[in-house]
Amino acid sequence: FLMLKNSKVNVRYGPSREDQIKFIYRKKNLPLKVTDKKENFRKITDHKNNSGWIHISQLRKSKSLVLMKEDILFKKKTKFSDPIAKLAEGKLVLIKKCQENWCKVKADEFIGWLELNNVWGIEINNSH
């Protein structure tokens, strides 16, 4: 997984600046799954299954997740901990660190632990 480096990124039909723009992302830090590589371009897929080619200068190592459904941010990495915030479906959060099936994340002004059951943007056995 990689994430968008900038708040406006062109996604193209093919792996070249000469290829037409398919659509434009306007969400900095959005995580994207790399499905192919060609020279300085990466073919990506997002959490809604949109796909296309992005120049590598517009991408960086992923440290973000998207919630696939509403979930709770907890004070500690257990569901028995105090809830800090309810996070909406589609919410973008930034990863601080991951342990087992949990990641400590920043969601707006909140920092807490999120279980990785309902997220997109990380391989579950991947630790940061």
What are these regions (language model features)?
Residues 17:
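Solvent-exposed hydroxyl-ligand-binding patches built from regularly spaced Ser/Thr
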Residues 1-13, 24-28, 35-76, 80-101, ...:
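SH3-family beta-barrel domains
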